[in-house]
Amino acid sequence: MNKQEPRIITTEDGSHSVYLPELNESYHSSHGAYRESIHVFLLYGLEAWYARNRGKFPIRIFEVGFGTGLNAWLTLIWAEQNQVPVLYHTIEPHPLSEKIYEALNFTQMDETLTHYNGYFKRLHKMDWDIGKPLTDYFNIKKEKITLQDVQLYPTDIVYFDAFSPKKQPELWEKPLLEKIETSMNPGANFVTYCAAGHLKKNLLSLDLTLDDVPGPPGKKEMTRAWKKS
C-alpha cells in the first residue's frame, strides 16, 4: 500500500476514523469519532437549534467536509426518528474511495440503529452534485467542490467539520466564514469541534453570538455561534 494513501485507524471509543498521511491529520478526534460527531454536531448543533425552533421545517443544514459520512448518517437517523424533514447540503473536494468507506465500522457502534445500516453506504454511493431524497425525511446534495467555489443556500445549521486551522488555515479565516455567515438564516447556529481563539474572534467580528459549551470527551471546549434572530 502507498504510504500516502488514507488508512483506517481506531479511536478511543472503538469507532473508526481515517488518517491522511499527506496532512498528518485524521478525520475525527482520536478520543472517539462516533461520540465526537454526536456531541458537537447532533447535540450542540441540530438538537440545540431544534429546541428553539420546534415546528419550523424543513431544517436546512450545510456541512463543510462530508468526509467519512458519519455526520450525514447520524443526521439522517435523527430525521427519521423524529419525523422531521431535513435538507442536507454537504461539500467534499476529495471523496473517500469505496475500499475505505466500506470498511468503516460506524454502523456497528449502536445495535439499536441496525435498521439504518444500509443508508450509510447509500450516502457514499449516491451521485455527486445532484440533490435527491434518500428517505421520506432526508434529502441530501453532495458536491465535489471547495468552500471557495460552492454556491450556498439559506441554512439553519452549519456543521463546520473541516481539517484543523493548522492544516487548512484558509478555511478558518474571515473571508470564507463571512461567506457562510451571509447564508445563515436568522437564528441559525454554527458548530465545530475547533475552539481556537482566532476562530472565535473571527466569528464575533461577523456579529455572531458565542456560547460557552463543553467539548466532546477528551476536549475541554468546542465552538458554537448563533446568528441573531
Predicted regions and their residues:
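A short SAM/SAH-binding and catalytic strip from SAM-dependent methyltransferases
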Residues: 156-171
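Conserved beta-strand/loop positions that form the S-adenosyl-L-methionine
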Residues: 62-64
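S-adenosyl-L-methionine
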Residues: 102-152
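Rossmann-like AdoMet
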Residues: 1-59, 77-110
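Class I S-adenosyl-L-methionine
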Residues: 196-229
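Glycine-rich SAM-binding Motif I of class I
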Residues: 69-73
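Conserved beta-strand signature within the Rossmann-like core of class I S-adenosyl-L-methionine
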Residues: 157-159, 184-194
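A short glycine-rich, Lys/Arg-flanked "PGG" loop and its adjoining helix->strand segment in the class I
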Residues: 170-186
